[in-house]
């Protein structure tokens, strides 16, 4: 079909006229672009406070304050004045629970707040409404701030707020499979936002923006490098570079983690062995953990991929996966660090002619007999399916086979098996099918989500982890 030239010119003119408006919506801002409300939606916020009292001072509280001021300015056209003490009249009060209760002793809390939970409450004070955003910790205050901004964006009334939210699980992390040269394994959104040319990027603006997006979703940790880890990540020079990434994450309450090569004591530590039960290897991991925490006091922990797809592991010395995990976990434990030990362990040279070769049961066969052998800060990181991240895989049987070991479910956000970012794909229904699946353990009603969150068998840690693999593309994921 031929398009008349005049029609083409009209189309081109209209597109050019609309282009400035289209560019005004930054893809980098994603869901945090805070579009101005229309007149009808904005009318209900005529009495919105003009002052925010920030009780306390920290990097995270400063982020909450700046985010609130930014969102209200764009959506409502109001400029909030920030003060450090409770003012007279209508106000927003933002701060940790102890400080807020000292300023507002009449505030009643009917339900217990846990770490990272938050309370949004509207109370009457001096004849006018005060909106309270509070939590046990600063990170919860930040999450409550994002929650209030969501309500404004949706045009929801704020006159009678009474919302207490606690997280379903303590672990809410994302992983990146970024290489030190700036490439990303299974990444479709451009080069790494963390690395280039074998070093941490000079400009970490996008890393900070990513942490902001993560915080708005309640995500509290991010491991930034490929699970097929480069041993150089633990070199003294590189640790100082990683401290810069941690500094970019810190204002948003996101803890930094890194994937490490299990063979590091030998490959870059100068030892003759990486046997996890060798005294020198044990001492090496302890010294390395101490060194990391001197540079990054709030470091989150390690991710380990061992005995899988050519990566070295404890089987080289006849040791178990628990032997390997516990040695590294004990080095991290005095500092509050976690060890995410991937259960993606199998022989990738399986002989298809052997009828007993069964990759789908490999993780269960290896880790189920070790249940109860892992230290408290070891978290087994289990892919949603027994093979990989394949579409429509059943839930991994290992979720139901661990009653005395903490675990997280590893989900794939990056579209390795769902089109590789050539088109959009709504992943939530697939994840929900797995999370809601009842594993029929001896306890009644044990869906995967309750098992990984630690609720089914009263585990201290556990939760959810997604492999994001965002990049420098404006829209992060490349779709």
Describe the role of every protein-language-model region.
Residues 160, 294, 312, 319-479:
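Substrate-binding groove of N-acetylhexosamine-processing glycoside hydrolases
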Residues 230-231, 266-275, 305-316, 346-355:
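Active-site-proximal beta-alpha loop/turn segments in soluble metabolic enzymes
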Residues 57-67, 71, 107-303, 333, ...:
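Feature activates predominantly on carbohydrate-active enzymes
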Residues 1-6:
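Positively charged n-region of N-terminal signal peptides that target proteins for export
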Residues 22-126:
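Acidic, contiguous N-terminal accessory segments
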Residues 8-19:
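Bacterial N-terminal signal peptides
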Residues 176-178, 226, 258-262, 306, ...:
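A cross-domain feature marking catalytic cores of carbohydrate-active enzymes
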Residues 45-46, 86, 124-127, 166-168, ...:
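Extracellular/periplasmic catalytic domains that process cell-envelope and extracellular macromolecules
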């Amino acid at each position: 079909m031929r398009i008349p030239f005049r029609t083409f010119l009209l189309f081109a003119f209209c597109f050019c006229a609309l282009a400035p408006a289209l560019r005004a919506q930054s893809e980098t801002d994603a869901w945090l672009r805070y579009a101005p409300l229309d007149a009808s939606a904005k009318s209900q916020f005529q009495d919105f406070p003009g002052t925010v009292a920030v009780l306390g001072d920290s990097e995270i509280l400063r982020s909450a304050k700046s985010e609130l001021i930014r969102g209200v300015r764009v959506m409502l056209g109001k400029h909030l004045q920030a003060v450090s003490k409770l003012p007279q009249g209508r106000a927003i009060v933002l701060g940790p629970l102890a400080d807020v209760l000292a300023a507002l002793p009449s505030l009643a809390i009917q339900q217990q707040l846990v770490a990272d939970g938050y309370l949004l409450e509207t109370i009457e004070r001096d004849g006018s409404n005060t909106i309270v955003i509070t939590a046990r910790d600063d990170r919860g205050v930040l999450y409550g701030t994002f929650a209030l901004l969501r309500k404004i964006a949706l045009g929801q009334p704020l006159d009678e707020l009474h919302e207490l939210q606690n997280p379903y699980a303590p672990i809410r992390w994302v992983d990146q499979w970024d290489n030190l040269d700036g490439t990303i394994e299974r990444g479709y959104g451009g080069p790494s936002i963390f690395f280039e040319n074998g070093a941490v990027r000079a400009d970490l603006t996008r890393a900070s923006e990513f942490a902001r997006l993560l915080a708005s979703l309640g995500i509290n940790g991010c491991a930034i490098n490929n699970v097929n880890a480069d041993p150089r990540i633990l070199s003294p020079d590189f640790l100082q570079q990683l401290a810069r990434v941690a500094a970019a994450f810190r204002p948003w309450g996101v803890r930094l983690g890194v994937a490490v090569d299990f063979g590091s004591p030998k490959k870059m530590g100068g030892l003759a062995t990486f046997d996890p039960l060798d005294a020198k290897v044990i001492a090496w991991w302890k010294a390395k953990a101490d060194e990391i925490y001197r540079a990054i006091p709030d470091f989150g922990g390690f991710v380990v991929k061992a005995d899988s797809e050519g990566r070295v592991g404890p089987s080289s010395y006849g040791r178990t996966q628990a032997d390997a995990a516990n040695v590294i976990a004990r080095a991290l434990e005095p500092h509050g660090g976690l060890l995410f030990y991937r259960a993606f362990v199998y022989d990738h040279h399986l002989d298809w002619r052997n009828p007993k070769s069964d990759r789908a049961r490999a993780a269960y066969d290896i880790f189920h007999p070790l249940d109860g052998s892992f230290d408290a800060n070891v978290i087994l990181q289990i892919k949603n399916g027994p093979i990989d991240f394949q579409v429509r895989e059943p839930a991994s049987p290992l979720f139901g086979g661990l009653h005395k070991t903490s675990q997280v479910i590893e989900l794939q956000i990056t579209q390795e098996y769902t089109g590789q970012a050539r088109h959009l794909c709504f992943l939530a229904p697939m994840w929900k099918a797995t999370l809601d699946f009842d594993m029929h353990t001896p306890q009644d009603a044990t869906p995967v989500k309750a098992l990984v969150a630690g609720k089914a068998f009263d585990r201290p840690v556990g939760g959810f982890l997604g492999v994001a693999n965002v990049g420098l593309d404006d829209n992060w994921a490349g779709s």
